[in-house]
């Protein structure tokens, strides 16, 4: 590669193309490929690099706690999970249809791992996603009420293609927090998908969200376009013999 060409690629921020140029040129000369095929190979390498960088950026923004993967989930240790059903969810048809997914089960059965694995699949397919623990979400809602930034918070969360709310359970909530959560779910209703992991059945949501009529309306929206998966199996956190 000439110094001029290297500088041009550097100025254009075509890092990957600059890194593979000599290798691809040598391979092209040996294989006697056409100029267009050679250029296509360079552009393809640059494109893949951009895609990988964009994915890493989206993953960082999504706040995934760990790089959970559906491929590495210990299905053999969790008979309560229907692997075929999870594979169907991994096709992301529920995201395309703006449907919700609620994973219900005791602590440690793998709800978060499966949910994060599905969120990663969505990220890999270019969707805007975010992971948030329920306690952190409600804390953020309370802080937004204090500084009058609720509308900004709702706008940010409502436009996400997939919002994963983890550990949705008994929390000490003020009525204003419950109201804000209802508004969020109302704005996401049949527009975007929400994944919720919880150890509570739907009949227990009234106990911590408060206002019965509001919770009934919330459940109507959450469950209308929704897949509910109940995981009844052993804890994956138990020591392995």
Predicted regions and their residues:
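Walker B motif beta-strand of ABC-family P-loop ATPases
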Residues: 162
């Amino acid at each position: 590669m000439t110094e001029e060409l290297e500088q041009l690629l550097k100025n254009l921020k075509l890092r990957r193309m600059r890194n593979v140029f000599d290798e691809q040129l040598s391979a092209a000369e040996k294989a006697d490929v056409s100029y267009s095929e050679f250029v296509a190979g360079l552009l393809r390498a640059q494109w893949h690099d951009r895609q990988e960088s964009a994915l890493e950026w989206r993953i960082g923004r999504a706040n995934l706690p760990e790089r959970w993967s559906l491929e590495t989930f210990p299905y053999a240790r969790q008979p309560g999970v229907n692997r075929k059903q999870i594979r169907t969810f991994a096709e992301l048809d529920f995201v395309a249809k703006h449907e919700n997914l609620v994973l219900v089960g005791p602590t440690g059965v793998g709800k978060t791992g499966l949910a994060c694995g599905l969120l990663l699949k969505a990220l890999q397919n270019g969707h805007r996603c975010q992971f948030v623990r329920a306690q952190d979400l409600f804390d953020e809602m309370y802080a937004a009420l204090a500084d009058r930034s609720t509308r900004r918070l709702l706008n940010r969360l409502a436009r996400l293609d997939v919002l994963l709310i983890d550990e949705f359970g008994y929390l000490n909530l003020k009525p204003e927090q419950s109201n804000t959560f209802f508004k969020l779910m109302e704005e996401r209703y049949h527009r975007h998908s929400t994944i919720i992991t919880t150890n509570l059945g739907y009949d227990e949501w009234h106990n911590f969200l408060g206002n019965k009529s509001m919770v009934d309306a919330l459940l109507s929206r959450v469950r209308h376009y929704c897949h509910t998966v109940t995981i009844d199996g052993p804890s994956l956190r138990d020591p392995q013999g």
